[in-house]
Regions:
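Active-site neighborhoods of divalent-metal-dependent phosphate/nucleic-acid chemistry enzymes
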Residues: 79-118, 122
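Alpha-helix capping/helix-boundary segments
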Residues: 12-13, 48, 88, 108, ...
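Active-site-proximal, substrate-binding regions of enzyme catalytic domains
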Residues: 51-79
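Glycine/charged-rich beta-loop-alpha catalytic/anionic-binding loops adjacent to active sites
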Residues: 33-37, 73-76, 91-94
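Short, well-structured N-terminal submotif of metal-dependent ribonuclease cores
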Residues: 1-44, 60-70
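A general structural signal for well-ordered alpha-helical segments in protein cores
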Residues: 25-29, 49, 53, 68-72, ...
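Residues that scaffold the ATP/ADP-binding catalytic core of kinase and kinase-like folds
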Residues: 15-17, 55, 129-130
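Acidic, PIN/NYN-like endoribonuclease modules and their adjacent C-terminal/linker elements
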Residues: 1-5, 82, 109-143
Length: 143
């Protein structure tokens, strides 16, 4: 059986490193477990480290910069970072316009769609527009 491709957005990748006050932590980390078992192939976009780092530095956690650097190094070791192609960015712009998304959120959806992957997200707009699935739903699908 081949691994299921899963693109994780920053809302999911953040849970791999930070749990206080976060939802779906166990499910997000469950995707990592399935990755280690080679049941899924996890990928993030090249913009994910910026989003995760910013959330840790400027968000609720207020994590010191030296620890954010450690997290970003760990993220780079966990899974590949994908750079969207020009075509995928074009699709992202169309999705952003159609669904009222930010371009960077739409980029996750466009890359996942173009590459035949599932998008793991906790972003309300992506979920409401059917562009991604919660980590718990993806784990459920995997059985």
């Amino acid at each position: 059986m081949s691994a299921t491709d899963v693109v994780c957005d920053a809302s999911v990748a953040l849970k791999w490193f930070h749990s206080a006050g976060e939802e779906e932590v166990d499910s997000a980390r469950g995707l990592l477990d399935r990755y280690r078992e080679r049941a899924v192939a996890l990928e993030v976009l090249d913009l994910t480290p910026y989003e995760v780092g910013n959330a840790l530095l400027r968000g609720g956690p207020g994590v010191p910069a030296h620890l954010v650097a450690v997290v970003l190094e760990a993220l780079a070791e966990i899974c590949p970072q994908l750079a969207p192609t020009t075509s995928e960015l074009r699709d992202a712009a169309l999705l952003a316009e159609r669904h009222g998304l930010t371009l960077y959120d739409a980029a996750y959806a466009a890359v996942a769609q173009a590459r035949g992957a599932r998008l793991a997200t906790l972003d309300r707009q992506l979920l409401d527009n059917g562009l991604g699935r919660r980590p718990s739903a993806i784990l459920e699908d995997l059985g």
